[in-house]
């Protein structure tokens, strides 16, 4: 049908647009890191030697309190920055990279437990902050309204692919490398993902800077359609 042909044409246009792929992989790296971060709570219990109750409190702090605060706070900061979500994601990337790099070189021991928990909270704030904004960059790059739906659908498809393999991959590391090393491999995996992410964010920021006028026109056109 004509409608199906139009959808396929829009999808083809989206797939031929380099910035769309960059956005999709940005979402992929953030979501994969978020998914892998679920192993931080068992790390506290298995490696740091926390009691199940104490590790549970860390999990509640990380997954509930930080989750509730991360997105609204990042949204507020982004608004104060003029809606520059990509730039703020880049800042969160740096926070995450520094925090996780410290965690990887920090010795395992009871005397470092408090520092480790602070680091886990910092990385959680960064990842939830990024998650709260990654769809906003679809608009920030000036996605034309004609292919907006196709771009959003493609970005979500690529972005959530980690659900297909993350648990298997992390589970393999924990089985093959019992104890601290298994979790260390997961943390290195997360670190690599966010390093890739910050590189891609740099590419997007350059793209946004070079195409300001066209992006502004596309955004105005999209807002006009929403207003109607």
State where each predicted segment sits.
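Helix-to-loop junctions at the C-terminal end of transmembrane segments
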Residues: 70-83, 174-175
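A membrane-interface helix-boundary motif in multi-pass transporters
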Residues: 85, 169-194
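Multi-pass alpha-helical transporter architecture, strongest
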Residues: 103-104, 183-222, 226-228
